């Protein structure tokens, strides 16, 4: 399943905040064998966001968006998605009740008009619960186009990816991607590239070098269905052993996602 991430927010484009959402989603999707092909960042602009959706669905099957689900006028993601698919929005009343409760607890008085907007999702979509925030997400599918819409705050996004999105996507993908990384010190990247060229031209498994400060990481990855994990592991180990024979100083390391 070809996938694109669209991160929405002018604050991302002007450098006010670092886009950690794309990194987190990419790592999690890789672990379950979802093919991530593109990442796009767009500001809070209706026309440009709609154009991003149009372009994305010309080249991928699944789009996941983060950001733009709040109560203010520049939070436009849900409206643009509704426009693109020709659907309406509907309020999830229990999420609106949460907003009312928050206002009352903080003595803010009557809920602002954007409260109902924040608590809405696309009609005919699957609700994605948000247990650490006020804006729900949703999953929508039409004409073989799938979209997952998530809030932008990293704390909310990460909880929803782990507890809502990954279990959902595992229904659509039986693939798994296994990886092993070797660290090689004392050899320039260019020389490693020459020596391991035949490995780097492989397709599955894939072998790729990544220059790090003072060393080079060589990542071996192989994709297959979940029932073939033992086979995948054996193939990866075989290549790792071959590379260790060429570079005895190569050490296996764990890279955090």
Model-derived regions: residue spans:
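Short, structured active-site "lid" loops
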Residues: 54-65
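Flexible gly/pro-rich beta->alpha loop and the following alpha-helix that scaffold active-site loops
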Residues: 66-88, 231, 248-253
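Accessory alpha-helical/coil subdomains and C-terminal extensions
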Residues: 140-221, 231-236, 240, 246
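Short beta->alpha junction loops
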Residues: 38-48
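Glycine-rich beta-strand-to-loop/alpha-helix junction loops that act as flexible
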Residues: 8-10, 65-73, 151-152, 223
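Short alpha-helical segments enriched in small residues
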Residues: 117, 231, 235, 244-257
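Glycine-rich phosphate/diphosphate-binding loop of Rossmann-like nucleotide-binding domains
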Residues: 1-39
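Proline/glycine-rich low-complexity loops and linkers
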Residues: 48-51, 58, 76-172
